[in-house]
């Protein structure tokens, strides 16, 4: 399947056009399981960037990756019901759950309740809260780095390991106490989220002692 057909679907997903997305899936059910064959390259950066979710589309990404990143609560279960692989890894090793925990506190598209619900739905369907990408990064690392406390809470409740070190030796707690360099991480909303994340991690770690 060409990237073009899948791109048409994911464009409708990020713009929240559920009616058209459902129509495309009904007309071509294979799209639910399809993966991008090429994805972003240096020459195609503009084509494969999804501004609505702040993500590039990489080779190996699926519609579920994009729906998870957009917290689409109708599309995510639909794709899963149609056979989408919740453990699908893109060329960087990221699974849909890695995308679901990303966010930008204070941005107009940021929706903590929808994000937490998306995380829970993916885990219910078999996603691993301790899955690692090629950099050893877990969903918890990403949720902490992007200052998404609701996602952190959902992951911890599902068994995410706050002591796991990525390939650089960083644990989620270390990332929680540092400036991540992520765009928007210095905003007042992000700082409030950071304080809540540190509290969540400390409480979780204390219960494990």
Where are the language model's segments positioned?
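Ankyrin-repeat-protein effector appendages
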Residues: 1-11, 112-113, 125, 158, ...
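Ankyrin-repeat boundary/"N-cap" motif
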Residues: 3-11, 34-63, 89-106, 132-138, ...
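Ankyrin repeat A-helix N-terminal signature
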Residues: 12-17, 54, 66-72, 99-115, ...
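Internal alpha-helical scaffold/solenoid segments in large eukaryotic proteins
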Residues: 73, 83, 139-152, 157
């Amino acid at each position: 399947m060409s990237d073009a057909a899948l791109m048409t679907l994911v464009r409708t997903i990020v713009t929240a056009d559920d009616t058209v997305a459902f129509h495309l899936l009904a007309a071509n059910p294979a799209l639910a399981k399809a993966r991008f064959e090429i994805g972003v390259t240096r020459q195609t950066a503009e084509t494969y960037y999804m501004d609505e979710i702040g993500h590039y589309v990489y080779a190996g990404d699926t519609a579920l990756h994009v729906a998870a990143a957009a917290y689409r609560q109708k599309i995510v279960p639909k794709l899963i019901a149609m056979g989408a692989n919740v453990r699908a890894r893109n060329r960087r090793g990221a699974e849909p759950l890695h995308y679901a925990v990303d966010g930008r506190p204070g941005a107009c598209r940021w929706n903590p309740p929808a994000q937490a619900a998306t995380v829970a739905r993916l885990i219910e369907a078999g996603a691993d809260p301790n899955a690692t990408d090629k950099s050893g990064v877990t969903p918890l690392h990403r949720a902490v780095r992007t200052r998404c406390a609701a996602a952190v809470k959902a992951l911890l409740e599902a068994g995410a390991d706050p002591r796991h070190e990525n390939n650089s030796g960083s644990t989620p707690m270390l990332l929680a106490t540092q400036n991540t360099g992520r765009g928007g991480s210095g905003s007042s909303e992000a700082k409030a989220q950071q304080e809540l994340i540190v509290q969540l991690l400390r409480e979780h770690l204390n219960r494990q002692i």
